[in-house]
Design a protein with these regions (language model features):
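Non-cytosolic membrane-interface motifs at loop->transmembrane helix junctions
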Residues: 136-146
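Bulky hydrophobic segments
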Residues: 1-138, 156-181
Length: 181
């Protein structure tokens, strides 16, 4: 049960954040509410995939012999192994890049890259800490940081690119300016 505590704290934090911003979300259109609620649901899924003690193996055996630091398996060598999780991480973070563009439309690309690296590094640091504290049994991998950041930036670039097409009419109602600056 203790292994689930970090995930439960994370989910509780998301709901507290949502409640604390309810005065702002009350001003949102129905399309903006869809953006906010789907972003929260997406964050819950990412939390589950990265911080919950799951027994799901989305990839086969790792091709890398990790360093063991404490009880955490750690890979600090970039691109040593490119298993299916390499591509899964890119796909997992693309929606986050899209949500960042919808929720914080004023962010410039450099800050988007930095935000993606910070979020990815934060996930890996949490996995390392939770491996030590509660035995989460997750790999800490530099490839995850790189591929997550790439997926984050790629998702942002997709929505920016679509904003320069006729699809902009569809995207615009979902953009939130409530949380900007």
């Amino acid at each position: 049960m203790i292994k689930w505590l970090p995930y439960m704290i994370d989910i509780t934090s998301l709901f507290i954040w949502l409640k604390s911003h309810s005065y702002q979300t009350a001003k949102a259109s129905r399309w903006q509410l869809i953006t906010i609620l789907s972003a929260v649901a997406y964050m819950m899924i990412v939390s589950y995939l990265t911080l919950a003690p799951t027994s799901y193996a989305f990839v086969g055996n790792q091709q890398v012999a990790p360093m063991i630091i404490g009880s955490a398996p750690v890979n600090l060598i970039p691109f040593w192994s490119t298993t299916a999780d390499f591509y899964q991480n890119v796909l997992m973070m693309m929606p986050m890049g899209i949500y960042i563009r919808l929720l914080l439309p004023y962010l410039k690309f450099e800050k988007v890259i930095l935000t993606g690296v910070i979020i990815s590094t934060g996930i890996e640091m949490l996995q390392f800490i939770l491996d030590e504290w509660v035995g989460l049994s997750r790999w800490v991998d530099i490839n995850d940081v790189l591929t997550n950041a790439f997926g984050f930036a790629f998702g942002w670039l997709i929505i920016v690119g679509l904003a320069h097409t006729p699809v902009k009419r569809i995207i615009l109602p979902f953009v939130i300016s409530l949380f900007s600056r």
